[in-house]
Amino acid sequence: MQLMNNLKDNGFLILVHLSNIELYYSSEENISDEIILLAGDEFKHAVKVMRSKIGDTIYVTNGTGLIIKTEILTIKKDKLSAKIIETIKTENKFENIFFCIPKLKNPERFKFAIEKCVELGVTNFIIFESKRTIAKGTNIKRWEKIALAAMKQSLRAFLPKIKLLRNLSEISESNGEKIIFEQNVKRKFQFEFKMDKSYYFIFGPEGGFTEDELKFFDADSIYSLSDHRLRSETAIVKAVSLI
């Protein structure tokens, strides 16, 4: 894309100065070499809530690492067009890290876990059901909306990917290092990150893992996060903070 010609690689330094901006999301099909379109909820927020008008500067991410500075050209009934002025490239340091999270009984605690992970940089989620999962039903669209909102709020530019798996055996077969958190082990969590490896961090549901589920994984892959019992969402946020 021609917009890459104006790319700024020092994304972190620029983002420090953009800490007060409002960030919008537009998918790749709405982005050309020179123009970005905003439609749907993003358009409504920009025009109805933020009162943006023709000539104003707005910032848009494409969800694949770019933050794009634009100037609004036209505003119509259900969409706006904006001219691309400059692009900022950001780095996905968690590209090879997968957070495997059980469905939690309390929707607000589940929402909290997703939000905080995204704010701290996680971009890959696997939501799974275990034998002791209490929560019923699946709402991937809601989870994706939560992740999208957290991405924009924290000025991140990688749209999180969320995948649903029915059991732990599917995760155990994934290609990468598995790290399982279980309260009843003595081995304390230690982590050395290698950029060329994939890591799967696996968290238990409210009732913990069963013995049969833990047999899917090597004993050396099981760690404790704390001397005290943590709620599932607390363990999730603590782990990503440590990483």
Predicted feature locations:
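A C-terminal functional module that forms or caps the active site or interfaces directly
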Residues: 199-211
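Conserved beta-strand scaffold positions in the cores of enzyme catalytic domains, especially
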Residues: 162, 178-180, 219-224
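Thr-Gly-centered strand-to-loop micro-motif
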Residues: 26, 202-205, 224-226
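Structured adenosyl-cofactor binding patch, chiefly the S-adenosyl-L-methionine
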Residues: 211-243
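RNA substrate-binding interface of SAM-dependent RNA methyltransferases
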Residues: 91-177
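N-terminal positively charged helical leader segments and presequences
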Residues: 4-89, 141
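Strongly charged, low-complexity linkers/loops
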Residues: 182-196
